[in-house]
Amino acid sequence: MINCVNESTLSWCNDKGENMTLTHQISRRLALALVASASLFSSVSIAAADKIKVAAIYTLPVEQQWISRIHKALNSAADRGDIEYTFSENVANTDYERVMREYAEQGQQLIVGEVFGLERAARKVAKDYQDTAFLMGSSFGGVGPNFSVFDNWIHEPSYLSGMIAGAMTKSNKIGMVGGYAIPEVNRLMHAFMDGARDVNPDVKFMVNFIDSWYDPPKAKESAFAMMDAGADIMYAERFGVSDAAVERGIKAIGNVIDTSGDYPGTILASALWHMEATIDKAISNVVSGNFEASDYGQYSFMAYGGGSLVMDESLVPADVASSVKAKQQEILDGLFRVNVNDARPQSDG
């Protein structure tokens, strides 16, 4: 029960989040006395309602590109005073379930993380702590009553970045280096390939996965091999690819974060992920008592501000930039839908 009061009436929210009002007039002193008494039996104080406790569990450092987007959004919420935020990073899959339970036992109201490598164990924890809200990056759906899922559905800006690459390649060969061939990665790569092919039917792709989320030397080595085979633009799904592009003097397309400042003159464009819309919706649902099992993936769409394209117009020709902006508007207006393909992408030829 969340209590609130003004001078003439007593209002409160019941456990279902419904607004309740005492209809007869009462004195300020009586109102305050009633609130003080009710607060003894209330599980959530006014202060706690304004600032909920949120914990995040990351399997990689918070600097890693995908993780950094979640961490940034949660820090923004903390800076606004909406949440008390704590986190654990570099948590091994073997320790993940234990850390989830520890945070739940501590009374964290919302636990955020990514459970691609331990789907079954994570759902078991959520079932054991049904008063805790869980929001997890996952390849599968949510499960009631309290386990929701999300992912970086930035296939739309990925398609747009593919248009740029397809229009600008001179060799008609584009290299693509990914981490793991999982649906979350595959759909972005396919969207990029579709965008490139739609403006350049002759383009061919070389695709490789390094089977790691963070191995820049291995990604760099794979990129060099593709460049040696004629690729003149690289899709940098993982760190290390853009470093190779800089060394060889070719262009690259970024993913999830904007690294153009780190690689000036190299990054043509990047498909960016903004986790704020997802996090803010989850926080709002927890505060209102409306959090339930659902898929928050839609909040990564461009229409919700969860995805965007950034391009370096000093590197991208004006006519190409104009075409991309027009297609972006079609997406935002609901006139063009980017295809979603979760299958493992393959090299051409």
Model-assigned labels for residue ranges:
Residues 142-166, 176-181, 264-277:
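Short beta-strand elements at the ligand-binding edges of bilobed clamshell
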Residues 287-349:
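Hinge/cleft segment of the Venus flytrap/periplasmic-binding protein
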Residues 53-73, 77-80, 86-96, 116, ...:
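Extracytoplasmic "Venus flytrap"
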Residues 56, 108-115, 135-137, 229-239, ...:
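Periplasmic-binding protein-like
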Residues 127-152, 256-266:
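Flexible loop/hinge segments that line or gate small-molecule binding clefts
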Residues 27-32:
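N-terminal export leaders
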Residues 81-90, 200-213:
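Short beta-strand elements in bilobed, periplasmic/extracellular small-molecule ligand-binding domains
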Residues 74, 160-203, 207, 295-316:
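An alpha-beta-alpha
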